[in-house]
Amino acid sequence: FYMTIFLIAEVTAVSLLMNYISGTDLWITSLIIISTSLGYTLYGGLRASIYTDNIQFLAMIILLSVAFYYIIYSGSENYSFEFVNKINPNLLSTGYLPNITAGLTFFIAVAATNLFHQGNWQRVYAAKSSKILKKSLFISFLIIIPIVFFMGFTGLVAISENQEVIPDLAFFYILLKEQVLIISILIIILAISLTVSSIDTLINAISSLIIVDGNSIFKSKGNYFKYSKYIIIILSLIAFIVSSKGFSILYLFLLADLLCCSAVLTVFFSFYKKSINQSNASLSIIIGLFFGLMFFPSPDFSKSILIGFLLPSDIFPEFLSQSLLFSSFFLATFAPLLAWKINKMI
């Protein structure tokens, strides 16, 4: 489920970007991206995906280098923390509670969801040796820190310059606001290559799950390799239809994050705690998902099922009503502990 949402969000992201730059209809970009990815991934499999990862990394470095150069040498005084602090001082305040809860929220979400990303585990087991794997992870760790910092900085600048900026396109808003043709063309090429490479990883990941789990779960021994291709095509059609609607990418990810948060402790602790059986694991995940959904915010982040819908918001502490997403993810992650306690009592 998470990887299907991820697939939809990836296609939606590049479709929105193309629409933002050139006005291209969402469905046209979605069709091109999905068709291209399926065309070589269903044939080349994991080898093709790993090969395109090299292209993806190169494209990412070029894109970030162009962005960094553009910001540094643009001459604008807006690209500084002083500007952000002047316009929106709360964004840089360590005493502003939403800053802390937002950071914790996305830490929980990213940690939980990536543990369920089969594409990551495929890369782990495809490594030639443990030594190479450790070296790769360490280098990736060093690379990703400045990238996340830079992307976060551009987001702060974008929202400070324009309160109406689309959050999903904040980074590209910075690069495209001057409407420089060569930069627009470069972004289109690099963004498409990045998206296609990410999508092929997801397609391979979903396909491998169908093959492995199909053989282990179902008693009938069918050709799950063949079945996986059919299922991938069906999921791609769903991704095409949904991405053509242009729904919020962030909200799609958050829905998938919620499910992963509700399952992460149960799934991984069950590897070590023999007391967590199948029925107890299912109950734990359901409890986590229930509590998470009760606090999961609406698309405008103003209310949730419990706060603002079933019960008025003013009877709850202000902390809860202002931190619905954090409360949702926190409860979804740790509420399954209740099921473990109940199981011990029984």
Region annotations inferred by a language model:
Residues 1-346:
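Membrane-embedded helix-loop-helix hairpins and adjacent transmembrane boundary segments
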